[in-house]
Design a protein with these regions (language model features):
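Transmembrane-helix motifs of polytopic, lipid-linked glycan transferases
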Residues: 162-186, 224
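Extracytoplasmic catalytic/substrate-binding loops of multi-pass membrane glycan-assembly enzymes
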Residues: 108-120, 129-145, 149, 153-158, ...
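Membrane-proximal stem/loop segments at transmembrane-domain junctions that anchor or position
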Residues: 309-462
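Transmembrane-helix signature of polytopic, membrane-embedded enzymes
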Residues: 18, 88-92, 178-201, 219-220, ...
């Protein structure tokens, strides 16, 4: 390692980039460590500094080694030809994944009816209201199979079983496609097997595969979109000359945007970015991607707003500002002026319900969501004014709600106390007008409803009942959260920092097109920072893209000659 620290090396641009990367990691690690241990990121100790410096030093050495290894191999090597995989490999990989997931499906049969599924079904089938608060494409995929099961078999449970299996099938094909394409990003077969083991055996994958949530299918489709972007960067001429590759990019971009409301704008911006980066082939890109943009805007925004009786509003992306104002009111009420207090109360009446990990108790009570949407400019002015006066409280509020995405040692037992790691128990009718469900360490959730007969709940009938307690424990008390090493290895933040490192390396070698996959992952993470809380299902796309980022980083070690042979 001595060659890393020669005088010429210390004066080089790679050293500067590596230093900037490591210092940024130092700042975020220090903030996360301080907040978790002392309640504020501004309460610093010798221990927190030592831990953060150690992480920064390791990051600096890794980054510098990566720069120098890539330079030795003549920069970022670009494959000159495809390393095609066969349909047999795709089907075999998909079958292996499905087989590995099957015990979860049989144990949880007909699937995990959790998260927002019960609400989506209530509006669609229970009272016949079009509600685009959740993506319509997922709502009608779910309710369509429920209706089919009820029509053919006289059972919503049968329909839900078909839906769950269809979701598993779609996800297994998507992941198999991603894994089979890793050979086009680097020449190490070990990456394929590592990714396959991760998808098959890491419990987050099979559990979310049998869970009725839009995040499951979105994550799989998003990983296909990202791997297509990576292939475009590595094989520009071949990729753009292949109708099949462009079609997969088109379809994955369209479906990814339709399966998550906050991802639609991200996908639109990325497609526009492609047009700018590949301006020499602007006409072809425009001809291929403009229809995708139009369809995405029509199906994801215009049509839902026109046909929906209930839609989301601007407050959906203002969870963090709401939390920052509420935290400031809670901690600085004695020094805030009466006019400012009145302004806060008029928009956030129940700010006293502040929970530093989730905004929902405030946002969905007292008419907060609608009040902010009705007078957004006033809310933003109030937010900015209090932010200038109390920046520390704003920063602490940011750390409290988002650290799971960027703090590599984040423990879900600390950051996720309002929601379980993964949901397992579904809603049950407790008594007339009341629905309830167990949420593990997060407590018991109760929901009072007026029309209990309109709430549809499939019956859970486990075909492997002995496995149910094991899966339940994996959802509520995952063993990898109890080990510092396993927590680090399975941290979504590790994927984000790896993507950031790839972006920096791309800047150094002036390969701006290679930045696109890394920027895509970073940009998705930034959309999550605006969400209501940190949840594993929101971070699931980061897990799905981990093999892609690993392949791109390992590809820096491949020699140009070997890649073109």
């Amino acid at each position: 390692m001595h060659y890393m620290f020669t005088n010429s090396s210390l004066r080089s641009r790679p050293t500067l980039y590596a230093l900037c990367f490591s210092m940024l990691l130092f700042v975020f690690t220090l903030a996360g460590y301080n907040f978790d241990n002392y309640g504020s990121c501004f309460t610093v100790s010798a221990t927190s500094i030592v831990v953060s410096l150690a992480c920064a030093c390791i990051a600096f050495c890794c980054a510098l080694f990566l720069f120098q290894k890539a330079e030795k191999n003549e920069g970022i090597a670009i494959h000159s030809s495809y390393i095609c995989f066969s349909l047999k490999s795709l089907f075999l990989s998909s079958a292996i994944i499905l087989l590995a997931w099957m015990p979860y499906y049989l144990a949880c049969f007909p699937g995990l009816y959790v998260y927002d599924a019960i609400t989506q079904v209530y509006y669609s089938l229970g009272i016949g209201v079009i509600n685009s608060f959740h993506p319509l494409v997922h709502t009608y995929w779910l309710t369509g199979f429920l209706s089919l099961g009820n029509l053919v078999f006289g059972s919503y449970t049968a329909g839900f079983a078909i839906y769950t299996f269809s979701q598993m099938l779609v996800m297994s094909i998507c992941f198999a496609y991603v894994l089979c394409n890793l050979s086009q990003l680097c020449r190490r077969r070990s990456v394929y097997f590592t990714g396959l083991i991760m998808v098959c055996l890491f419990p987050v994958f099979p559990i979310l595969a049998v869970s009725a949530t839009k995040d499951s299918a979105f994550s799989a489709l998003f990983s296909v979109f990202v791997v297509q972007l990576a292939k475009l960067c590595r094989h520009e001429e071949c990729f753009l000359g292949s109708k099949k590759e462009v079609s997969v990019l088109f379809i994955s971009a369209l479906l990814s945007g339709l399966f998550r409301n906050n991802a639609m704008i991200l996908i639109v911006l990325l497609l526009l970015m492609l047009i700018v980066v590949y301006r020499s082939k602007r006409q072809f890109i425009v001809m291929a991607l403009i229809p995708c943009l139009i369809l995405l805007l029509l199906l994801g925004s215009v049509v839902p707003k026109k046909i929906s009786q209930i839609t989301s509003n601007s407050s959906e992306i203002l969870g963090l500002p709401i939390q920052q104002i509420a935290r400031t009111m809670l901690l600085q009420s004695d020094s805030i002026s009466q006019d400012e207090k009145d302004a806060v109360v008029s928009m956030i009446p129940n700010w006293g319900l502040y929970n530093q990990r989730i905004v929902d108790p405030i946002k969905f009570s007292g008419g907060t969501s609608q009040a902010i949407a009705d007078d957004l400019p006033s809310f933003l002015r109030l937010w900015a004014k209090l932010g200038f006066e109390y920046p520390r409280d704003y920063i602490d509020a940011f750390v409290a709600q988002t650290e799971g995405y960027w703090y590599i040692f984040s423990n879900y037992d600390t950051v996720g106390t309002t929601k379980p790691y993964l949901e397992f128990d579904q809603w049950e009718v407790m008594e007339s007008g009341t629905l309830g469900r167990d949420m593990g360490q997060a407590g018991y959730d109760v929901y009072n409803v007026q029309d209990i007969e309109n709430w549809i709940i499939p019956f859970r009938h486990s075909l492997l009942p002995s496995l149910l307690p094991v899966i339940r424990k994996l959802c509520y008390d995952p063993f990898w959260m109890n080990s510092l090493f396993l927590r680090l290895v399975t941290s979504p933040a590790l994927v984000v920092w790896s993507a950031f490192l790839l972006a920096i390396v791309s800047v150094h070698f002036r390969k701006m097109d290679l930045m696109i996959p890394a920027v895509t992952i970073i940009a998705y993470t930034m959309t999550c920072l605006l969400g209501p809380c940190y949840l594993i299902r929101y971070a699931f796309p980061l897990y799905c893209c981990a093999p892609i980022i690993l392949s791109l980083l390992l590809g820096l070690f491949d020699c140009s000659e070997s890649l073109s042979s």
